[in-house]
């Protein structure tokens, strides 16, 4: 099944900066959407064609001419300097779950641009005032936060929550071991928050242990455990039952989101969703990272060390005590994270293959024999057929992290609720133009903006 090491096809046919969008449709097309101001209906793919013309079938887009392969696009996104771009302010809330665990929600705070005198062109703001406010709200014992991010006071949090009466909500799920601080997530948050002169309230849900969130229950994220997403969304819906809620998932976050959508089926509280650069099949994704020479040498070790670092910074909470006895046999439903020891962490720090990490930590916690078994079970392509809400999917065939073999052509054609937009360029989550702006994030924002405005 798997290939020995090989050099990928890096030929002129895979180079370029003028990309093209292609719709993947079944014979019956896509599900009809009802307009809010009339009795008219329109299929999802026709809605995109008419109201998001930059995503219509055959649409062209232009990327940075110097980043002319998916490898270069993705490498620049991960290693380039974006410190002066996407100047988003976040207000952080600690989210407590029913099992005693926590994550954090970073609410986009566009009003802080005025509060802290943001000069976007110079990428400057009143850092002294922000620092004073940050010190006044920072909870004791929690790590310092990324730039332009601070905890909300109780009064600010109450005001933030009150927006639920007036603003539709967009929830953003980040990539593997990432968070709100990542350039792509900041770009997405910025684009979403500017739709319709600020029509959306936007929040990034940072997974347990990510983006300087704490782990409190000796439990960390996996692609199979969507309970935190479910609990957060259900809580938001319970607070404001009439509020429209949307979600955007990026990379691993897209896998989490589409797993959740498939599990919820007809009971999903979301009105629409967007999945960007989803690694639909984790086995094929691992194969790409392990056996594609370029992907292996450029990205595999980095992703593996992202995971290892997440464990390391949370080791005080994750570490099992000496002579720890497992109280029950680990299962997917009742995992036991019993392999989180200092000895295993030392092993993981030498890993270069993500499968090594999941063999040691993730699979045993669920009673699975190995990481590949976990990958097969956790792949969101398994749950795509049961997605029942309008969902926009964007994947690039030159994605150097997932490869094009993960793209779910058959399943997308068979599910009228989804529209798969295949692009021939863009890399993994990158799609950077000559100004280092992301074409991809703008498509997600444009789609949700038009959907919220026009669809019932």
Curated annotation (Swiss-Prot):
Top-rank taxon, per record: Eukaryota
Keywords: Acyltransferase, Hydrolase, Serine esterase, Transferase
Active-site residue numbers: 251 (charge relay system), 399 (charge relay system), 428 (charge relay system)
Keyword Transferase in annotation: yes
Extent of the signal sequence: none
GO annotation terms (biological process): medium-chain fatty acid biosynthetic process; medium-chain fatty acid catabolic process
EC number: 2.3.1.84, 3.1.1.-
A molecular function GO annotation: short-chain carboxylesterase activity
Domain AB hydrolase-1: 168-434
Catalysed reactions, as listed in the record: an aliphatic alcohol + acetyl-CoA = an acetyl ester + CoA
Record has Acyltransferase as a keyword: yes
Role summary: Displays enzymatic activity both for medium-chain fatty acid (MCFA) ethyl ester synthesis and hydrolysis (esterase activity). MCFA are toxic for yeast and this enzyme could thus be involved in their detoxification by esterification.
Family indicated by similarity: Belongs to the AB hydrolase superfamily. AB hydrolase 4 family.
Protein name according to UniProt: Medium-chain fatty acid ethyl ester synthase/esterase 1
Gene: EEB1
